[in-house]
Amino acid sequence: MAELSISPDEIRDALKDFVQSYEPGKASTTEVGYVLDAGDGIAHVQGLPGVMANELITFADGTLGLAQNLEESEIGVIVLGEFAGIEEGMEVRRTGEVLSVPVGDGYLGRVVDPLGNPIDGQGEIATEGRRALELQAPGVMQRKSVHEPMQTGIKAIDAMIPIGRGQRQLIIGDRQTGKTAIAIDTIINQKANWESGDTNKQVRCIYVAIGQKGSTIASVKGALEEAGAMEYTTIVASPASDPAGFKYLAPYTGSAIGQHWMYGGKHVLIIFDDLSKQAEAYRAVSLLLRRPPGREAYPGDVFYLHSRLLERCAKLSDELGAGSMTGLPIIETKANDVSAYIPTNVISITDGQIFLQSDLFNANQRPAVDVGISVSRVGGDAQVKSIKKVSGTLKLELAQYRSLEAFAIFASDLDAASRRQLARGARLTELLKQPQYSPFPIEEQVVSIWAGTKGKLDEVPVEDILRFERELLDHLHRNTEVLSQLKEKNVLTDDIVDAMDKAVDQFKLEFQTGEGKPLASVGSEKFEPAKAEDVNQEQIVKGKR
C-alpha cells in the first residue's frame, strides 16, 4: 500500500490560486419573501427586511409590485399588472430599484400605460433614459416667476383668466360641462407654435387620462389626430378597467415624462383628467393596505398626494435652462359643490381656477365659464399686452350685466342707460361663445373683444353676433394688415386702433342681418348705440316703500 503524502507547497499553491480567482461580485445574497394574502390588486408579503419605500419587487410569475407599507412583520404591495395569478405562499424577490419610467422625445405622438409601455400598437418607443416617479419638485431658488403666456385659444380664458407658463390652473365643474373640451382646445392651440420650429415657442403636451372610459380616450386621441395635434402630444392612459394602483400612478408617470423635457429647457403642458378619480383610486388602495381612514374615508396624506404632484409644475430659473411645465388639473364636482374635500384641497394648491357651471352650459353658453368666480392669481403678469389692454373692463362689465339682468327680471320699466347696459352685456356674452375644437389666435381675440367693449357691436342683433364676428375676421384677413400687425407686435398701438376702427366701420356698412336688412337700418330701429360712460357705470335703483 502506497503511503499517502501531503505536500504543504501544493496546498499553499491551491489556496493561493483559489484566493486569486475569487470574484466577490459573483457571490451575492438575495432577500426572498412570501405572499401572505393577495386580492384586489394588493398583496401582503412577509420577509424582505431590507426593502425600500417605492421599491420594485418581483413575484415568481414575473409580475411587478410596488412596496408601499413597510411594517414590522410584513409589507403592503401594489401589484403592477394582472393579480389573478398571485397566490398565498408565492415567492417574492427584491430588485433594488425604485419605480421609474422611460422618457424622451420618442413618446411624442404615442399612447402609453402608467408604466410607460406603449399600448397603441405602433411598436417600441425609442427612449433617452429613465426617470423616477417620486422625484422632488424644484425648490424656491430653482424657480422663476411666471411671465410668459400660455394661450388657450379660448376668448373667455385668455382675456379674463390668463394662464402663464409654469402656472397650475384648475378646471373645475360638474360632469358634462366641457372641462375636457377646454383642455383639448388648449392642446390644439399649441399647433401654430409647434409648426413655427422655434424651440422657445414650442410646447410639448401630455394628456393624462385617469379612470376615463376607453371610448372617451379614443375620441380624445381622434380629435387630436384630426386637428394635427397628436405629433406633439403624449397620452398616458389608465382607463376605468385598470386596477386602482395604475390610476394612482398615472399622473406621476405623466409628470416624470414632462419633467425630463422641462429640465431640458423645453416647455410642457400637462393635463390631469381628472384628479378626483385619482383621489378615489388612492383611497381604495389605502383602505386595502389597511391605512387608517380620515375625512370621507380618504387617508390622512391625500393633500400631499396632490401637492407633491402639482408642485412639479414650475417655471425654472435661467441657470436650469428656463424650461417650464404648466399644469391644468381637472376636478369633477357634484351639484356645483366646490366646498367638498378634494376640490378645496386642489383649489388651495393651484394658482387659480376656472369654474364651469352646468346652468350656463345648459343655457348654451359654451364654454360655460363663470367669469365672476373664476380667477387667475399669477397669469396677469404673463398676459399679452394687446389682449390685456382691450379686456381691462370686460370682467367688470359682465359682472354688472349679470347683476342688472337679475334685477331687470323684476323691473317693469328700466331707464335708457340700464337698457343700453343690458344690450351691451348680452352681446358681450354672445361674443364669448365659441365652438369646440376651434381655438382663436390671440390677434383675432383682440379684434373681437375690442369691438365688443368699444360698442362696435351694439347695433348688431344678438343672434347675428357670431356670424358678424366670423365675417369681420375674414374681411380683416383679406383686406387689411391689422391682424398681421397685431400678431407681429403684440401691442395695441394708436395706428392699429385707428386701422381697426376704420375697418370695422367699413364692414358694418356691408353687413346684412339674418333677415337680409342692412345693419344701419336695424340699429336705428332698435336702440341707440350705447355710450361708454353709460355702460361702464352701474346704476342702483331703490324703490320707495
Curated annotation (Swiss-Prot):
Signal peptide: none annotated. It comes from the Bacteria. Keywords: ATP synthesis, ATP-binding, Cell membrane, CF(1), Hydrogen ion transport, Ion transport, Membrane, Nucleotide-binding, Translocase, Transport. One of its GO terms (molecular function) is proton-transporting ATP synthase activity, rotational mechanism. The record marks 374 as: Required for activity. Its EC number is 7.1.2.2. It is a peripheral membrane protein. InterPro entries: ATP_synth_asu-like_sf, ATP_synth_asu_C, ATP_synth_asu_C_sf, ATP_synth_F1_a_nt-bd_dom, ATP_synth_F1_asu, ATPase_a/bsu_AS, ATPase_F1/V1/A1_a/bsu_N, ATPase_F1/V1/A1_a/bsu_N_sf. It catalyses: ATP + H2O + 4 H(+)(in) = ADP + phosphate + 5 H(+)(out). Gene3D superfamilies: 2.40.30.20, ATP synthase alpha/beta chain, C-terminal domain (1.20.150.20), P-loop containing nucleotide triphosphate hydrolases (3.40.50.300). One of its GO terms (cellular component) is plasma membrane. ATP binds at residues 173-180. Its main location: membrane. It is found in: Cell membrane. Pfam families: ATP-synt_ab (PF00006), ATP-synt_ab_C (PF00306), ATP-synt_ab_N (PF02874). Belongs to the ATPase alpha/beta chains family. Produces ATP from ADP in the presence of a proton gradient across the membrane. The alpha chain is a regulatory subunit. HAMAP family: ATP_synth_alpha_bact. F-type ATPases have 2 components, CF(1) - the catalytic core - and CF(0) - the membrane proton channel. CF(1) has five subunits: alpha(3), beta(3), gamma(1), delta(1), epsilon(1). CF(0) has three main subunits: a(1), b(2) and c(9-12). The alpha and beta chains form an alternating ring which encloses part of the gamma chain. CF(1) is attached to CF(0) by a central stalk formed by the gamma and epsilon chains, while a peripheral stalk is formed by the delta and b chains. This is ATP synthase subunit alpha. The lineage of its organism: Bacteria, Bacillati, Actinomycetota, Actinomycetes, Micrococcales.
